[in-house]
Curated annotation (Swiss-Prot):
This is Protein I. Belongs to the coronavirus I protein family. Pfam families: Corona_I. The keyword Iron-sulfur does not apply. The keyword Glycoprotein does not apply. InterPro entries: Corona_nucI, N2-like_embe-CoV. Transmembrane segments: none annotated. The lineage of its organism: Viruses, Riboviria, Orthornavirae, Pisuviricota, Pisoniviricetes. The gene encoding this protein is included within the N gene (alternative ORF). GO terms for cellular component: virion component. The gene is N. Keywords: Virion. Structural protein that is not essential for the viral replication either in tissue culture or in its natural host. It is found in: Virion. It comes from Bovine coronavirus (strain OK-0514) (BCoV).
Length: 207
């Protein structure tokens, strides 16, 4: 610090020179953009990014030109007395892409969408469903009858009374099934099928 108080020599100036490293032009390039007035530091491999930006700007300008071209064609036909209602439909279909109003090209893929059928699908007919429902109570009643016979042999008075009433109602329902089928006809599958005869059940002892 003592040398700073006296006269500055050329050797002292060389000590305070900032070290500037020479830049390799192959590693760093300065490209000026005259439209925006900015400098973009570009390294190797980023030239493709700038070319992509240029192509994107050109595509946007082409979209605007396409939109203006369609509107100018409609204005020309409107003054000649020509019906212009079908012109917007014919012009986009002539090409493989459609120029929308916002300047974006969209591919026409409306025909590729799957068409779903709105018709209801029936898994099984009502006749087979009725037949299946008829077989369920019959199996249940047969199991209940066997349980009731065991309880009657054990001698529980209250259980025997309640089961006797239930079994009698079940037998009555089974006997009325043929009459109900004739009174309320259903699918031909159920009508043509003969009703199986009901097996004789052992008479229950009275309480």
């Amino acid at each position: 610090m003592a040398s700073l108080s006296g006269p500055i020599s050329p050797t002292n100036l060389e000590m305070f020179k900032p070290g500037v490293e020479e830049l390799n032009p192959s590693k760093l390039l300065l490209l000026s953009n005259h439209q925006e007035g900015m400098l973009y530091p570009t390294i190797l491999g980023s030239l493709e990014l700038l070319s992509f930006k240029r192509e994107r700007s050109l595509n946007l300008q082409r979209d605007k030109v396409c939109l203006l071209h369609q509107e100018s064609q409609l204005l020309k036909l409107r003054g000649t007395g020509t019906d212009t209602t079908d012109v917007p439909l014919k012009q986009p279909m002539a090409t493989s892409v459609n120029c929308c109003h916002d300047g974006i090209f969209t591919i026409l893929e409306q025909d590729r969408m799957p068409k779903t059928s709105m018709a209801p699908t029936l898994t099984e007919s009502s006749g087979s469903l009725v037949t299946r429902l008829m077989s369920i109570p019959r199996l249940t009643f047969s199991i209940g009858t066997q349980v009731a016979m065991r309880l009657f042999r054990l001698g529980f008075r209250l259980a025997r009374y309640s089961l006797r009433v239930t079994i009698l109602k079940a037998q009555e329902g089974l006997l009325l099934i043929p009459d109900l089928l004739h009174a309320h006809p259903v699918e031909p599958l159920v009508q043509d099928r003969a009703v199986e005869p009901i097996l004789a059940i052992e008479p229950l002892p009275l309480v």
